[in-house]
């Protein structure tokens, strides 16, 4: 349910915050715990396009800081490879947490995209996640990202590998879109921790 998801997001936020040079665990925890409050409202139920935006106004009324208000509104950005990014690092953290949580939940019950079938838009979630990590951090540490998941999930070797290979595939496609040559990517793209400088040197 929404409460359980909010708890998961708060924990993921704390673990990936350092990737974005954000170490305020109290704020990261609060961000996750309140990130889905608008989804239980009748207004968002009737107009789902208002999710996030509705929460921003609720946060404003309840005295949340402006950076958290923006983060609540921007948590669903970017859409895939779209360049419309969150306005601050808190928004980026919450977006990445949302997407890695979504992937882990679907993958854990065997709902993995195959061929052209992707009814739950999981490739888009993967693209959004890679997009933010590329533009907002200095590393693409897939291990650290996956280790941010619930302990039970992060110890499931099969699940971890499925998510990792999926994200590596999304990263490969993202970098091709960014103008990298496929033959030069092959040698380094399967590494767990990837320094962006390594990629930029071969572009």
What kind of feature is each model-predicted range?
Residues 1-203:
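Amphipathic alpha-helical "coupling" segments that flank catalytic cores
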């Amino acid at each position: 349910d929404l409460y359980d998801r909010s708890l998961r997001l708060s924990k993921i936020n704390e673990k990936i915050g350092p990737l974005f040079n954000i170490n305020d665990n109290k704020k990261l925890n609060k961000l996750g715990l309140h990130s889905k409050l608008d989804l239980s409202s009748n207004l968002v139920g009737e107009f789902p396009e208002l999710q996030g935006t509705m929460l921003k106004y609720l946060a404003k009324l309840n005295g949340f800081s402006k950076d958290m208000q923006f983060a609540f509104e921007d948590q669903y950005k970017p859409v895939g490879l779209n360049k419309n990014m969150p306005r601050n690092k808190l928004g980026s953290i919450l977006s990445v947490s949302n997407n890695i949580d979504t992937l882990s939940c679907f993958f854990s019950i065997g709902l993995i995209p195959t061929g052209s079938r992707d009814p739950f838009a999981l490739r888009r979630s993967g693209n959004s996640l890679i997009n933010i990590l590329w533009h907002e951090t200095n590393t693409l540490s897939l291990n650290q990202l996956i280790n941010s998941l619930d302990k039970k999930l992060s110890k499931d070797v099969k699940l971890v590998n499925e998510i990792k290979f999926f994200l590596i595939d999304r990263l490969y496609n993202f970098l091709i879109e960014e103008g990298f040559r496929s033959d030069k990517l092959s040698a380094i793209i399967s590494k767990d921790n990837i320094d962006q400088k390594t990629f930029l040197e071969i572009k």
